[in-house]
């Protein structure tokens, strides 16, 4: 389950990075 959540977080991060520049 943790692996699935990690993949989801990675996917969300990639989606967000494509739509907007990271603030960090």
UniProtKB/Swiss-Prot annotation:
List the molecular function annotations (GO) for this entry: ATP binding
The organs and tissues expressing this protein are described as: Expressed at high levels in testis and at much lower levels in brain. In testis, expressed mainly in germ cells. Widespread in brain with highest expression in cerebellum and medulla oblongata. Also expressed in renal medulla of water-restricted animals.
Output the Gene Ontology cellular-component terms: cytoplasm; cytosol; nucleus
Induction (UniProt): By heat shock.
Compartmental location: Cytoplasm; Nucleus
Keywords, A to Z? ATP-binding, Chaperone, Cytoplasm, Nucleotide-binding, Nucleus, Phosphoprotein, Stress response
ATP-binding as a keyword? yes
Name one process (GO BP) from the record.
response to unfolded protein
Which residues does the record list as Phosphothreonine (modified residue)?
A: 19
Quaternary context: Homodimer. In the testis, forms a complex with p53 at 32.5 degrees Celsius which is scrotal temperature but not at 37 or 42 degrees Celsius.
Outline what the protein does: Possesses chaperone activity in vitro where it inhibits aggregation of citrate synthase.
Which family is this protein grouped under? Belongs to the heat shock protein 70 family.
This protein is called Heat shock 70 kDa protein 4L
From what organism does this protein derive? Rattus norvegicus
């Amino acid at each position: 389950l943790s692996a699935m959540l990690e993949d989801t977080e990675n996917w969300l991060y990639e989606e967000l990075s494509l739509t907007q520049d990271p603030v960090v």
